[in-house]
UniProtKB/Swiss-Prot annotation:
Gene that encodes the chain: mutH
Annotated family: Belongs to the MutH family.
Annotated SUPFAM superfamilies: Restriction endonuclease-like
NCBIfam families reported for this sequence: mutH_TIGR, PRK05070.1
Annotated protein name in UniProt: DNA mismatch repair protein MutH
Cellular compartments annotated: Cytoplasm
GO terms (BP aspect): DNA modification; mismatch repair
Organism: Shigella flexneri serotype 5b (strain 8401)
Length: 229
């Protein structure tokens, strides 16, 4: 079998993207890094996004850290997901930064969360810490769009969380709010503050927040597509 090669330009079709992702299945992160002339870090403590960046290179992703999808021309977002030996997610999945001001008139249909989750290429990666990073294998990819039930679940959580933000209750939101979608602080340090609305409608400074998919949502999603089929 010939070795895969990184895509040098963004894929032009979903089929091309999926075919490239399928070629990576079974390879270790160390093998993929070496094939592209990259050094695999010892761990992810200082390189938390390294796996995502590595796979973006292989798949020809274009967006980087921009708010559009990773494959903007296709409307597809790339999500790597660390899993255990049974294929269960090991952590929550970051979706996007939560806007804490200027939310009047925003609906679920026009929200950044829905835009990011409209079409997702999920790539499971072995994530157990007992496996050295270079030896962790890439799993089979899944191109996914939310079905009606998933869209309803996410919408209900999003509306509950956005109501709290708009009503000045952002600092009361905990990771327990939302059944499948949660909001929690997203900042490398506690000094990185952003504006939000306080309980009396005043401007306050608070930690930036991010939307995350809870493990129960991604676990059911992966189980339905990989274990049942």
């Amino acid at each position: 079998m010939s070795q895969p090669r990184p895509l040098l330009s963004p894929p032009e079709t979903e089929e091309q993207l999926l075919a490239q992702a399928q070629q990576l299945s079974g390879y270790t992160l160390g093998e993929l890094a070496a094939l592209d002339g990259l050094v695999t870090p010892e761990n992810l403590k200082r390189d938390k996004g390294w796996i995502g960046v590595l796979l973006e290179i292989w798949l020809g992703a274009s967006a980087g850290s921009k708010p559009e999808q990773d494959f903007a021309a296709l409307g597809v977002e790339l999500k790597t997901i660390p899993v255990d030996s049974l294929g269960r997610p090991l952590e929550t999945t970051f979706v996007c930064v939560a806007r804490l001001t200027g939310n009047s008139g925003v609906t679920w249909e026009t929200s950044h969360v829905r835009h990011k989750l409209k079409r997702v290429l999920w790539i499971p990666v072995e994530g157990e810490r007992s496996i050295p990073l270079a030896q962790r294998r890439v799993g089979s990819p899944l191109l996914w769009s939310p079905n009606e039930e998933e869209d309803r679940q996410l919408r209900e959580d999003w509306e509950e969380l956005m109501d709290m933000i708009v009503l000045g209750q952002v600092e009361r939101i905990t990771a327990r709010h939302g059944e499948y979608l949660q909001i929690r602080p997203k900042a490398a340090n506690a000094k990185a503050l952003t504006e939000a609305i306080g309980a009396r409608g005043e401007r306050i400074l608070t930690l930036p927040r991010g939307f995350y998919l809870k493990k129960n949502f991604t676990s059911a999603l992966l189980a339905r597509h990989f274990l049942i089929q």
